[in-house]
């Protein structure tokens, strides 16, 4: 996405790799999220699927049905990646990523700005949430990392991240080897 001199997006085009949510996706997501409060109506599209065809990352609408803002554009839904994020967080990788962000201020600032523009571009009401990635204060704390789940979801779902090299190194494989997550009746 290009940003012109006035800070406005010169080209708001949605990624062509996003796909609509299918009936099978809805069934699977309801099973995966049966222990969470998960509002399927907030889902705009599937941003990424694994090689087994299951949703890994969802694109969420920037506003809930009642109109309140929802700043998280990309939502990680893959159980394998969810577990991997938890493992990395337990190894204090959030701090490491924040330190890396501090060495890439221009890239991180652009990432937050383009994320906000993308989020606004899919808004049905034109809601303008004045924050960066996942609701992070992109002005006051641009290097803050809320969680690795948000980072992984944005990296995989948007295919754009200022620390893509670091994420690739830390995550290695971005999916499980057997598609077990498609069977939600037993743990993956």
Residue ranges and their predicted role:
Residues 2-188:
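Preference for intrinsically disordered or flexible, low-complexity segments
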